[in-house]
Amino acid sequence: MVRCVYSIRLYEHLKKFCQDRMYPLQLQETDYGHPAQKNEVSHINLTKFLNGLGCPFDLRDYQYNAVSHGIQNKRAILLSPTGSGKSFIIYNLLRWYINNFDKKILIVVPTTSLVEQMHKDFTDYGFDPELVHKIYSGKDKTTDKQIIISTWQSIYKFSKEWFEDFGCVFGDEVHL
């Protein structure tokens, strides 16, 4: 079971914070829209897309619901127990993102072993490992590849400009 929490709560808190203090709040439009906008999800089209990925595994209902929730809400925190297929959820979300947008994707994990595990999982799902770049100690930090898996420790000192190339960020192991 995946529990889907956060959709636009941070935006709503920020909006109230600014209103209470009479601060101006300006939303900057991007290709992905702003936090209050939602994507329409056609379950027929999404199912057709996901089935067409050629994965050797089928999404379980709770995984499909998490993918659908993430797409519809554009941002979310998905709470899921160990062994429930979080990497597979991330994989399906990133495949949808690649299909719909042309920006890089950053996946941030807490350890180098999880960088390697996520990379291996994507390969097991049928994804070309040459399309994914891994960043951690001792690895090259520059790449033209669209998907980057990294530890937060390897990138947190990077300049703001480095992050501007990313249209989508996934974090594994988020603690509230």
Annotate each predicted stretch with a short phrase.
Residues 97-104, 126-129:
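Post-Walker A helix-loop "phosphate-sensing" segment adjacent to the P-loop in P-loop NTPases
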Residues 33-79:
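Conserved pre-motif I regulatory segment
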Residues 72-97:
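Walker A/P-loop
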Residues 137-148:
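Conserved motor-coupling elements within RecA-like helicase/translocase cores
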Residues 103-111:
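Conserved RecA-like ASCE P-loop NTPase motor core of nucleic-acid helicases/translocases
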Residues 152-154, 161-176:
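SF2 helicase catalytic motif II
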Residues 1-32:
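N-terminal accessory nucleic-acid engagement/regulatory domains that precede
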Residues 112-136:
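Conserved helix-turn-beta segment of the N-terminal RecA-like "Helicase ATP-binding" lobe
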